[in-house]
Structures are given as structure tokens and as C-alpha cells.
């Protein structure tokens, strides 16, 4: 999904209609073709990942198909643990687009985490930030092989994967702000919730959910809000770390893969900030780190691809920024727009994380009063 005209402009010269047309051809892919393609990508990325993928496939630990008219299937995709077998199982309800490939890569990241986990089920917990990085990080790393996997669709696939992460980083902050507004106002009516969600979305420039008059009620389609309160923000923090890993992969591919494999071996309950620090990654709650990440992403977006960025680094003389075009001033302005989008979202993350403590105290106080 396109986040803004600025981001689309930065990538428009590299992503043309022909690339999207090539991705559209994947609509006719069979499940076996999807498994073959993603399996090849895992083999190219790291032999260990290829080995785990073959284990998953040989033991039929997946259900990947589209629902037929007479068969009802759960929407979306997920991975569940099978603790009695010390295994996991991937479920994907296909929508017959290139997203089926993305879904398998994402869920395979979760599968790998279960594969390497050694803590018995009854003793284990999990940190959503790390768990989602194990899947989102694999999505971002897979873009390196988009050319061999998707042919002419490589630039469109890379753009869609990167913009998905930016989208999640921003909307996760928006959802968190909405949750806190609801929990700190126990008497809020449904209409008030719908109006409040629209107000919050408007403060984020209103790009994300459909508006109906002065209300926006598509938040009801987010199941996490009902069964796992305050969970969704973890998708945003992990998305930023996935983007950080992607930037690192352009500087040191082998090092980035080693970091990813190391994070997989951290297990399901590794603490987020401690894990990021241990592997030398940016702290998404540190303003300086986020500013640096936004600059790096803006520079890469300005060149149109990670490959162009790498080529630019080797071709530019010392002191000259890579990827600068003849329209240098306009590109710089667009880079600042990208930075603003990311910084605005992260600023909200920092504030909201502090407010979570207050929300908990309010809830505890209400419970005590009822008793």
C-alpha cells in the first residue's frame, strides 16, 4: 500500500507498471510453485533456513490453499505451535496474489522460531516484538532475492514489502493511541469510539481507514483489540527493527543474516530491547537511533533500490551522497518527508509506551473500586 505521494515519488522511477504486471502473473501460481519458489529463496539466504524449510515441507506441516465455494476457511494466515510434537504448523488462506508468497515467508519466520525453541510449552512466554521481528525480518531480507524469485516483478515486490513495514510502524502507533483513549475513558460509547478513532486517524493525516461521515469504525476488523489488548504496538516496533535489519543487509549481508539467525535462536521469550542491544541493532525508543534510521531509509528510497544504493556507494566520490539526481533539491525535500513520517510515528511510540503504565494503574483502580 502506498503511504504517501512523497514515498511513491521517491520510488516511482524504479517501480514501473511492467514490474507490477509481472507480479500480477503470480495470481495463477499453484501451492507447489509457491513452496518451490520460497524454498529456493531460503536456500539462497542461508543453508540452515533451507534445511528447516525442507523439514517443514517433507513433514507436511502446512495448509496452504484457497477456500472453495463449499468450504469455509479462516481468513488470514497464522502459525501455531504443536508442543506435544515439538513442532509448528503453518496455515495460509490464499488470496491468489503475490501476497501469498509474502505470507509464506512471514509465517515461515514464525515456524523457524518454534523450530529452534527449546523451552517446554508450559514454561515459555513470548515477546511480540521479537516474535514479529523473526517474521518481518525474514520478509525484508528476502527482497535481496526478489530478482531470482519474481523476475521483472522484483522492484515492485521490494517496494511493497518496504512500504508495508512503514505502514505497520505508523498504524501501530495510531491503534495504540486509540486503545489508550478507550481504556482511560470507561464510559465511552460505541459512537464515541468511532468518532475518536476518526479524530486520531485525522491526526495521522487520515490515510489508513475508510471514513463514514464523522466516524471511522473499521477498527473493529482488528481482532487483536478484542483478544489481546495493547498487543498491536509490537507490530510497529518490530517493523522498525526489520527495516533496520534491511539497512544493515545492504552494508554487510552476511552479518545481517547472522544477526537474523541469532535472533531466531533467542527463542520466543527473549526480551525485546535487550535482544536488539545484544545484536547491535538500533533502539527504536532512542530518538537519535530513529533519526539515523529515517535518514538511511530516505537515502535508499531516493535511489529506488538496495542494489542501486550499493552501486552508488561504490561509484560516488568521497563526500558526495549516493543516489543524488539532477533534481537534488526536490529529492532532499522528499527525503525529509520520509523522515518526518517515521519520526512522527516513533515519537508517538515513545510517548505511548510511557502512558501504558498509567493505563494499567487506571484499570487496577477501577477493579479495586468494583470490589
Summary of predicted features, one role per range:
Residues 1-89, 282:
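Contiguous, non-catalytic segments that form substrate-binding/exosite surfaces or channel walls
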Residues 352-371:
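C-terminal membrane-anchoring or membrane-association module
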Residues 127-156, 161-167, 238:
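Post-HExxH zinc-binding segment in Zn-dependent metallohydrolases
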Residues 44-51, 80, 110, 114-120, ...:
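Conserved helix-loop functional segments at active or binding sites
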Residues 310-345:
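Short, aromatic-rich amphipathic segments at membrane interfaces
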Residues 95-115, 135, 140, 238:
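Active-site recognition of the HExxH zinc-binding catalytic motif
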Residues 6, 10-14, 104, 148, ...:
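C-terminal, non-catalytic "cap/extension" segments appended to globular domains
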Residues 17-26, 50, 85-97, 114-128, ...:
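Glycine- and acidic
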